[in-house]
Amino acid sequence: MKKLLLTSTFLLLAVSSIAQLFVKPTTGGSSSYVYAKNVQIYVEGTINLEKNPAGDYEGSIYLRDDAQLLQGGTATYNSGDGLLSVYQTTNADQFDYNFWSSPVGLNAGGIGNTANGPLRLNVSDDDTAIATDTGIRNFTSAWAGASTTNALTISQAWLYKYLNATADWQYIGGTDGVPAGYGFSMKGTNTTNHNDAYNDPNAQTYDFRGRPNTGDIDINLTAEESTLSGNPYPSALDLALFFYDNTDVEEFYFWDENRSINSHYYIDNQGGYGTWIPLNTTPGHQGT
């Protein structure tokens, strides 16, 4: 096994810069991977990931403990059938909505960003784990999802994307691809602790695995319409900079709901959208 460990303990600077990144199994067929913990990896060029053998170290890049992957310069689109693994944690339970945007796409086809396809969501209980868990997500047609020690069961009933062309929600179930940059709705699993969202022992950690998205990602949006979008990259996004770089954007909406109400019926729930715009607004003029 060949591995490259990048942690803030060993790097002094919490940024590692790489011209190009190519990760593939060893000549003997053993897994090779990059494990990044609490650091930023900056790749100036392209990333090519060749899939490792199935097993505990199937991924080619593991981002853990707020590690981020950034690409810039003249980087073209990524390629290969290898997997980047990045965690997202939420305490939204089987009655509460998540709005997700995948930082990865299918690890198949030619170069470039791909739709996230059938949802590849693993479950993990250890934020610094390297190994993959034995149970990839399962789907159920029931309204309520569930989780066990090593697997998630996600309800297909709440999987939707919002299309600008029709100005309406479209059911995707567990199979329809969502293009890079677009979002989708999903309810969580089990019942979580609503008293402490940041230290909830029942919170779920979702492991997004696939080819890392990169480059410019266009979201088509017609006048007077809305769309469900999100951060499509395996790194943080400065929303103010995004706002000023996109002159057609007027404002952002964030969903929140009363998570102490455990019901799937719309009439029972309390929720709504909060509006956010940066100070000294200019691009969309809505907030001025």
Segments from the language model and where they lie:
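Intrinsically disordered, low-complexity linker/loop segments enriched in Gly/Pro
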Residues: 137-170
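Beta-sheet-dominated scaffold domains
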Residues: 224-288
